[in-house]
Amino acid sequence: MQAIADSFSVPNRLVKELQYDNEQNLESDFVTGASQFQRLAPSLTVPPIASPQQFLRAHTDDSRNPDCKIKIAHGTTTLAFRFQGGIIVAVDSRATAGNWVASQTVKKVIEINPFLLGTMAGGAADCQFWETWLGSQCRLHELREKERISVAAASKILSNLVYQYKGAGLSMGTMICGYTRKEGPTIYYVDSDGTRLKGDIFCVGSGQTFAYGVLDSNYKWDLSVEDALYLGKRSILAAAHRDAYSGGSVNLYHVTEDGWIYHGNHDVGELFWKVKEEEGSFNNVIG
């Protein structure tokens, strides 16, 4: 088992480097080639063209070319925020490909391990591939070190890996959410350019503007667990109501020191009428 872990996991030295605050030096080593991170990523063949990103955009960008043959599944609303009771993660479940709804039941939360969650926004395939691969690295780290990987280290591995394919046309905006005793509740935003940001509140996707409106108006650090769960649902509902690319249902998670808890799947249609009756909101809709 140890030999298998050694073959496929991040070297001990690198993981320990990640868990300290020398991230600037680590990033510099990665760019110059001194870091062993460049040997971690799966080998993917890049098309032999000058700019894969521009080529992909020319053949898949529906807004500029409605007749394009390749319609990538995109459009979503995902959010995560910290509060005194941990982290709330809420996502919708609609996937669109061009102007049609490809699915209403997409699972946009990747359960990396019992303490770590990743969200999906952008290209579904990119998010699923990279976050699933990250999960295998987190598990191999546990086998080697006999302890869970930190949220900072997991997000750093992901950002460094996707940075190698910057400009290759990847489409990914994810939040890595977890809880460790050393870090507490922690959220990192990572995108396909290698951007990595730590924060308290993130909304990602085509419906993020509408979700932020509700979230910013009602967010407080000292929210109760019940109020925080409701705020997560309500924010996604606002996005699903106004954004054509968001909808379906709301999947809700609560991340605590003891791990994440799934709080169910809530149909947007049923939730809408319930909220309308309780709040007296959505007065533009008559039912």
From Swiss-Prot:
PROSITE patterns: PROTEASOME_BETA_1, PROTEASOME_BETA_2. Bortezomib binds at residue 124. GO terms for biological process: proteasomal ubiquitin-independent protein catabolic process; proteasome core complex assembly; proteasome-mediated ubiquitin-dependent protein catabolic process. It is found in: Cytoplasm; Nucleus. It catalyses: Cleavage of peptide bonds with very broad specificity. CDD domains: proteasome_beta_type_5 (cd03761). Pfam families: Proteasome. Its EC number is 3.4.25.1. The active site is at residue 76. SUPFAM superfamilies: N-terminal nucleophile aminohydrolases (Ntn hydrolases). GO terms for molecular function: endopeptidase activity; threonine-type endopeptidase activity. GO terms for cellular component: cytosol; nucleus; peroxisome; proteasome complex; proteasome core complex, beta-subunit complex. Disulfide bonds: none annotated. The proteasome degrades poly-ubiquitinated proteins in the cytoplasm and in the nucleus. It is essential for the regulated turnover of proteins and for the removal of misfolded proteins. The proteasome is a multicatalytic proteinase complex that is characterized by its ability to cleave peptides with Arg, Phe, Tyr, Leu, and Glu adjacent to the leaving group at neutral or slightly basic pH. It has an ATP-dependent proteolytic activity. This unit is responsible of the chymotrypsin-like activity of the proteasome and is one of the principal target of the proteasome inhibitor bortezomib. This subunit is necessary for chymotryptic activity and degradation of ubiquitinated proteins. PANTHER family: METALLOPROTEASE TLDD (PTHR32194), PROTEASOME SUBUNIT BETA (PTHR32194:SF3). The side chain of Thr-76 acts as a nucleophile, and the N-terminal amino group acts as a proton acceptor. The 26S proteasome consists of a 20S proteasome core and two 19S regulatory subunits. The 20S proteasome core is composed of 28 subunits that are arranged in four stacked rings, resulting in a barrel-shaped structure. The two end rings are each formed by seven alpha subunits, and the two central rings are each formed by seven beta subunits. The catalytic chamber with the active sites is on the inside of the barrel. This is Proteasome subunit beta type-5. It comes from Saccharomyces cerevisiae (strain ATCC 204508 / S288c) (Baker's yeast).
